[in-house]
C-alpha cells in the first residue's frame, strides 16, 4: 500500500511531461546549418541586387567580401 501514492505521482509526472513532438528543434537538426547557409546566401544576393545597379564597387563587395 505504501507504493500506491508513489506510483500515482509517477503516473502524473509522466503524463504531464512534454512529448518528443512538442519539443523545439535543437542543434541536432542535421539541416539547420544548411538552411542558415542558404538564408545568408539568398540575403546576400538580394542585397547585391538592390545595390549593384547604382554602384559597381558595391557589387564587388557583396560577391567577394571586400572592397579590393
Curated annotation (Swiss-Prot):
Signal peptide region: 1-22
Full protein name: Conotoxin Pu5.5
Domain comment quoted from the record: The cysteine framework is V (CC-CC).
Gene Ontology molecular function: toxin activity
Positions annotated as propeptide: 23-49
UniProt PTM comment: Contains 2 disulfide bonds that can be either 'C1-C3, C2-C4' or 'C1-C4, C2-C3', since these disulfide connectivities have been observed for conotoxins with cysteine framework V (for examples, see AC P0DQQ7 and AC P81755).
Compartments reported by the entry: Secreted
Expression (tissue specificity): Expressed by the venom duct.
Pfam families the record matches: Chi-conotoxin
Family: Belongs to the conotoxin T superfamily.
Source species, domain of life: Eukaryota
One of the record's GO cellular component terms: extracellular region
Keywords: Disulfide bond, Secreted, Signal, Toxin
Amino acid at each position: 500500500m505504501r507504493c500506491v501514492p508513489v506510483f500515482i505521482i509517477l503516473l502524473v509526472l509522466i503524463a504531464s511531461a512534454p512529448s518528443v513532438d512538442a519539443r523545439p528543434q535543437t542543434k541536432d537538426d542535421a539541416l539547420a546549418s544548411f538552411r542558415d547557409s542558404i538564408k545568408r546566401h539568398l540575403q546576400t544576393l538580394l542585397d547585391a541586387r538592390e545595390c549593384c545597379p547604382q554602384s559597381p564597387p558595391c557589387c564587388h563587395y557583396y560577391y567577394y567580401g571586400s572592397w579590393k
